[in-house]
């Protein structure tokens, strides 16, 4: 027997028992007559000790380095009261070693387990990094999350059905990872960005409750919280309304938070996309932050200040105010930093007004734009924003998107900087009624979610007549400012699907070439269906309290989509490329 107990499972009830432990040397203290070691496995750490009276095993112990892999046999002993370590789960006991087997000693480590290592070091030696208790705990939590999800899905009649990894490239927003076919020379498979079409086809096949915990792939420009391969909890249902789907999934997340964190999330509020953008400048609002944007275009449309009156009178303009309680104490340097910050989002500046004394008229206001605004205007602004003495007002005035993005980001930053955001709270919500389409930089329409999302309460003819104002029957679950899941009611009418493709500029020939199988399937009694997908990586981030998505993935990629440990991607064997009919063209470096 290599192991009778996990290290972290030992406690006072095991005193007097002989146990066999297998794990790694975590720390060593040589006190001359005794050598104390902490032995670690995935469940925790326990202290063992060697007595010099047993010369043979004492000699072996003297040769062991940190991270040596060993087997320990010994007797569990209660520590003296004065020696109890309350910082350790096993701190009431220790193990007197009677025998030791060295599976493998360890070379000098390239990582220092007692210090912060660079992320590059951690990713290069990931197998060592994962031995750290805090990393092991995150992956154990991830496993428990997936176990909970599987139980919940099984209890609610869902079937776990796998969908293909090698599939056809279809336009879903990001670039596909392509896999060349040796058998079909010159043709390529695509790795799925999501199982979207296959899960819809499963609904058409009669499997009315499907789920899958599945890898997805997107070849896109990466951010700190994105990975080229990521894991979804993918869900689809037939004969359920959007409200019923949301209730099912809300109950799952509610149960998950109780199971993992003993936190009751309560009933999730529902907010339209329009309300979220107006009040918070984001379609994934962090409701732990009490600050809100207040629209004031009607108050400022007649002032003699172009920065305000032009967007206030423009159809695509927006003028809004962010009131920060006690913000009048901000220094000019801090305000200048916020001005630079909103510039990242396209804002040309950041007007502000300190309300030093709300009862002193213009004399109680300090602002570089005060000369353009009279007392009546300021009185209206103060009333609209509920400002009081000691507050500061930040103004956003520009095109609607610029103001919404910049002021929404400023709201988050100020909330963090001034400790207004309650970091101990959990604030979930549903965001619904997204626009069906959005305009790209060239003014063309693209699907805000994906082209299989159903519009809300529209016929194909009505949608074609006014696509810009169409509302999608879509919904996102947001927790603490993170979109953890999103979905929609799907199109199940072939005419509606062709109409959406047409609005997106996909002609009939391309529709048949790219989606012919879907359009055919829609003709044969397709049921109404709806679903969504959760990001497992992001859920695990939230539950474990980390802000780095790489901490909850066993073997993640860098932000450059590389694996430092295996050195992937790598150059392919020339013979393999020849068999595939592929020639690699070297890109010329930009001068």
Curated annotation (Swiss-Prot):
* GO function term, MF aspect, one: aspartate-tRNA ligase activity
The protein's superkingdom reads Bacteria
Major place of residence = cytoplasm
Matching entries from SUPFAM superfamilies are given as: Class II aaRS and biotin synthetases, GAD domain-like, Nucleic acid-binding proteins
Keyword list, A-Z: Aminoacyl-tRNA synthetase, ATP-binding, Cytoplasm, Ligase, Nucleotide-binding, Protein biosynthesis
Residues recorded as binding L-aspartate, renumbered to this chain, are 172, 218, 449, 490
Family per similarity comment: Belongs to the class-II aminoacyl-tRNA synthetase family. Type 1 subfamily.
What's the stated role of this polypeptide? Answer: Catalyzes the attachment of L-aspartate to tRNA(Asp) in a two-step reaction: L-aspartate is first activated by ATP to form Asp-AMP and then transferred to the acceptor end of tRNA(Asp).
Q: What is this protein called?
A: Aspartate--tRNA ligase
Native organism is Actinobacillus pleuropneumoniae serotype 7 (strain AP76)
């Amino acid at each position: 027997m290599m192991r009778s107990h996990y290290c972290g499972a030992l406690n006072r009830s095991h005193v007097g028992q002989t146990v066999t432990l297998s794990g790694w040397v975590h720390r060593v203290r040589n006190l001359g007559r005794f050598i104390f070691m902490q032995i670690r496995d995935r469940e925790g750490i326990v202290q063992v000790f060697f007595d010099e009276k047993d010369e043979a095993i004492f000699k072996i112990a003297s040769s062991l380095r940190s991270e040596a892999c060993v087997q320990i046999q010994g007797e569990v002993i209660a520590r003296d009261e004065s020696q109890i370590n309350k910082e350790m789960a096993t701190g009431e006991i220790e193990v007197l070693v009677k025998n030791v087997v060295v599976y493998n000693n360890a070379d000098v480590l390239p990582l220092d387990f007692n210090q912060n290592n660079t992320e590059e070091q951690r990713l290069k030696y990931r197998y060592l990094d994962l031995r750290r208790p805090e990393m092991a705990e995150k992956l154990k939590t991830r496993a428990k999350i997936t176990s909970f999800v599987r139980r919940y899905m099984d209890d609610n009649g869902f079937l776990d059905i796998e969908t293909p990894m090698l599939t056809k490239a279809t336009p879903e927003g990001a670039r596909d990872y392509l896999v060349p076919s040796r058998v079909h020379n010159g043709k390529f498979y695509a790795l799925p960005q999501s199982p979207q079409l296959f899960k819809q086809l499963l609904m058409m096949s009669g499997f009315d409750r499907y789920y899958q915990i599945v890898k997805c792939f997107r070849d896109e420009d990466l951010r700190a919280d994105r990975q080229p391969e990521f894991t979804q909890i993918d869900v689809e249902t037939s004969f359920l309304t959007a409200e019923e789907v949301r209730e099912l999934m809300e109950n799952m997340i509610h149960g998950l938070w109780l199971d993992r964190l003993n936190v009751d999330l309560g009933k999730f509020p529902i907010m339209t996309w329009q309300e979220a953008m107006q009040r918070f400048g984001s379609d994934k609002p962090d409701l732990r932050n009490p600050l809100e944007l207040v629209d004031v275009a009607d108050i400022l449309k007649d002032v003699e200040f172009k920065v305000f009156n032009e967007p206030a009178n423009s159809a695509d303009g927006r003028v809004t105010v962010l009131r920060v309680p006690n913000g009048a104490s901000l220094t000019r340097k801090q305000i200048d930093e916020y001005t630079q910050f909103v510039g990242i989002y396209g804002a040309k500046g950041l007007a502000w007004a300190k309300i030093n004394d709300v009862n002193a008229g213009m004399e109680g206001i300090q602002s570089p734009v005060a000369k353009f605004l009279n007392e009546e205007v300021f009185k209206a602004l103060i009333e609209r924003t509920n400002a009081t003495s000691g507050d500061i007002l930040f103004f956003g005035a520009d095109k609607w998107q610029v103001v919404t993005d910049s002021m929404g980001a400023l709201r988050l930053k100020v909330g963090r900087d001034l400790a207004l955001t309650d970091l101990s709270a959990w604030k979930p919500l549903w965001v619904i009624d997204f626009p069906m389409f959005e305009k790209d930089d060239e003014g063309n329409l693209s699907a805000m979610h994906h082209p299989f999302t159903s519009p809300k309460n529209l016929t194909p003819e009505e949608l074609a007549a006014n696509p810009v104002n169409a509302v999608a029957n879509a919904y996102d679950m947001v927790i603490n400012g993170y979109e953890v899941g999103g979905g929609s009611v799907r199109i199940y009418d072939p005419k509606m699907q062709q109409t959406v493709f047409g609005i997106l500029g996909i002609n009939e020939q391309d529709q048949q070439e790219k989606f012919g199988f879907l359009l055919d399937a829609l003709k044969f009694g397709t049921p109404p269906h709806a679903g969504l997908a959760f990001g497992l990586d992001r859920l695990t981030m939230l539950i474990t309290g980390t802000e780095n998505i790489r901490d909850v993935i066993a073997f993640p990629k860098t932000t450059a989509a590389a694996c430092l440990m295996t050195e992937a991607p790598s150059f392919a064997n020339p013979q393999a490329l020849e068999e595939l009919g592929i020639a690699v063209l070297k890109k010329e470096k930009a001068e």
